[in-house]
């Protein structure tokens, strides 16, 4: 019989994703077959699975922690916001349709069936399923038809741990308030609390823990310390910028679109010792960069208009006049062409708009969505290097610019470059995950003697470090008595 434990949080970014990853790694190295599961995820950072679908990147990292390949059953419902009130709905890894919030609310009963189908399939394959909730279970306006938090826990009858982030303050109010807002049956299934990101002397916290346990009649199952410089992929929030400590560095700037997607593409750059990396927000300038990267977006036309409203198109033109380099990824590639056509109204009311015009091709948005994991060779310097990545897009780009490709995948060309070699563009995400490719791209951008950073190995090290910390401060055998050592 499969053991299921659900992690819910008092807020978004309380530490749910991280704790699930830690538990998956701890159990996996005990020889237990464990899988992560998130019924519903709302995120613009996604991953392509081996079965050809799309899930949240958080679940992909959790699968890595568990030592298994990511699968669409680990995140059966993925919502990718495209406007303030609407999102693309991904079911079992495939795009279903764009829905407004009220339409999705009506769809939840159907969505719950998809969630349960995936969960039951995982039950047949794994000894333990560690489930991650979404946001907070105490959102009163979202309680009806809930499939992401207590609605799921009640349906499958699983115990729940509630985690809260003490570093942000108000941890006792968050925990007590969340518990108070749950129904009686939901309160009963809460087996305890975890306090995350604690700094300082634990002795000073103990009176508060005693009060919390007496107030709620729930145990504190662990206090996870603030883990300095823990580098795992961020699912939602943009992570902090970095500044290179090396005297020789490359200044890379990335404009933050309103619907920026897959910003985890840049995590390896943030950690590279020779890169001065920064996201550039509204009202900030792109000037002074060596390399400007135009990232992916869930709404290319809207974010192209946003780019122009910020004056970034003018700054990009100046950057190129002075010899700067530009890389366009996915939606960023589409912006660099001469025109974008949306005849089916996929991103916006049916229309055509002018692109930035730096590369000779046009993009037409189609109802078919490309989802691919890829390996190939990057051809931007004298010597081709191995590269891996993935595609997630709903556009078809064609034109003379693609006669100058930058990647070959199984003999097929991909991407394009300008005649003067200042601009390159590709649909591939994950360009910087492979050390040789990162080294080549930084060299193309002007960094001599660029070092190789093995990002995949770094994530493995970080997952192990995280698991070690969590295992020291939580009684894992008590949580999973069936598998106690």
UniProtKB/Swiss-Prot annotation:
GO biological process terms on file: cobalamin biosynthetic process
Listed GO MF terms: ABC-type vitamin B12 transporter activity; catalytic activity
Keywords: Cobalamin biosynthesis, Glutamine amidotransferase
Chain coiled-coil ranges: none
Family matches, as NCBIfam families: cobQ (TIGR00313), PRK00784.1 (NF001989)
Family: Belongs to the CobB/CobQ family. CobQ subfamily.
Entry protein name: Cobyric acid synthase
Native source organism of the sequence: Saccharophagus degradans (strain 2-40 / ATCC 43961 / DSM 17024)
Highest classification ranks of the organism: Bacteria, Pseudomonadati, Pseudomonadota, Gammaproteobacteria, Cellvibrionales
Gene: cobQ
């Amino acid at each position: 019989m499969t053991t299921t434990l659900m992690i819910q949080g008092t807020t978004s970014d309380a530490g749910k994703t991280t704790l699930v990853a830690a538990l998956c790694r701890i159990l996996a190295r005990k020889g237990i077959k464990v899988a992560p599961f998130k019924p519903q995820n709302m995120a613009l950072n996604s991953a392509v699975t081996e079965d050809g679908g799309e899930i949240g990147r958080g679940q992909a990292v959790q699968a890595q922690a568990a030592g298994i390949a990511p699968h669409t059953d680990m995140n059966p419902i993925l919502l990718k916001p495209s406007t303030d009130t609407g999102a693309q709905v991904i079911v079992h890894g495939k795009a279903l349709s764009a829905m407004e919030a009220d339409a999705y609310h009506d769809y939840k009963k159907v969505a719950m069936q998809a969630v349960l189908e995936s969960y039951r399939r995982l039950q047949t394959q794994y000894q333990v399923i560690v489930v991650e909730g979404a946001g907070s279970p105490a959102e009163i306006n979202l309680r009806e038809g809930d499939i992401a938090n207590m609605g799921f826990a009640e349906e499958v009858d699983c115990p729940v741990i509630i985690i809260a982030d003490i570093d942000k303050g108000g941890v006792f109010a968050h925990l007590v308030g969340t518990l108070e807002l749950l129904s009686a049956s939901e309160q009963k299934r809460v087996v305890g609390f975890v306090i995350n990101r604690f700094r300082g002397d634990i002795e000073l916290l103990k009176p508060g823990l005693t009060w919390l346990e007496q107030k709620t009649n729930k145990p504190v199952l662990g206090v996870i310390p603030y883990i300095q410089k823990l580098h795992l992929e961020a699912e939602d929030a943009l992570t902090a910028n970095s500044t290179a400590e090396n005297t020789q560095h490359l200044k890379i700037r990335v404009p933050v679109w309103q619907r920026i997607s897959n910003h985890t593409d840049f995590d390896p750059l943030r950690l590279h010792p020779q890169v001065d990396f920064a996201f550039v927000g509204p009202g900030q300038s792109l000037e002074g960069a060596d390399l400007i990267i135009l990232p992916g977006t869930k709404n290319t036309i809207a974010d192209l208009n946003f780019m122009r409203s910020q004056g970034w198109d003018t700054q990009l033109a100046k950057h190129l006049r002075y010899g700067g380099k530009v890389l366009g990824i996915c939606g960023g590639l589409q912006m660099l062409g001469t025109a974008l056509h949306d005849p089916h109204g996929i991103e916006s009311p049916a229309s055509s708009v002018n692109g930035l015009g730096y590369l000779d091709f046009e993009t037409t948005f189609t109802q078919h969505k490309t989802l691919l994991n890829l390996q190939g060779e990057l051809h931007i310097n004298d010597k081709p290097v191995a590269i891996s990545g993935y595609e997630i897009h709903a556009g078809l780009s064609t034109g003379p610019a693609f006669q100058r490709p930058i990647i070959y995948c199984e003999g097929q060309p991909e991407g394009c470059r300008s005649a003067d070699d200042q601009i390159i563009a590709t649909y591939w995400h994950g360009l910087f995950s492979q050390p040789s490719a990162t080294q080549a791209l930084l060299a193309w951008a002007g960094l001599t003697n660029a070092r190789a950073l093995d990002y995949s190995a770094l994530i493995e090290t970080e997952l192990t470090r995280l698991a070690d910390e969590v295992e020291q401060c939580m009684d894992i055998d008590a949580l999973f008595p069936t598998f106690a050592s």
